Amino acid sequence: MAENLNYAYTGVPYDKDNYTSDSISWCYNNDASNCAKYGRLYTWAAAMDSVGTWTINGKGCGFRNECSPTYPVRGVCPEGWHLPSETEWDSLRTAVGGGAIAGKMLKSTSGWDDFNGEHINCTDAYAFSVLPAGFRVYEGSFKDEGLHAHFWSSTEYELEGAYYAYYTLWYSYLDKASLYNSYKYSGLSVRCVKD
């Protein structure tokens, strides 16, 4: 998928720990124009389809719940697509020359500026078109639009599986793309992979 997912849950019966069907994905700064530009930002539970609306592969996966998903996890992705695992993200980084240059190779040629507002030269050599969508912090604020891109994986972080999952981070000011872990309540972008 060459763009971030922009699917809003509507009518999904989900209510856990103050997260309802209206608060499991967001537009950056709650501005609909940012969804059109960057796609939505999802909690890990939403990305995994923890309520099992479409498939049971990610059912029960969410904050404070360790899970053993059945791979591939369709999650919130359209039929015939799935949420990439940590291994799939790492394979993508390797395929384009390694993590040290993956950011430069896969980031969009526009939208990336450094801290001084100077344009960053990215090649988007594989038409993957990563945009700096930023993320939603678990307590509700939004950060890093124009500076970073964060994408969920379907893989829990092994040391804190109930609370954290792996994601990829793309920097405006560096050529690399890195794998880290994030709090599952955070709002990150989603890219889907064709089955």
Give residue ranges: language-model regions.
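Conserved positions within compact, well-structured domain cores
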Residues: 1-195
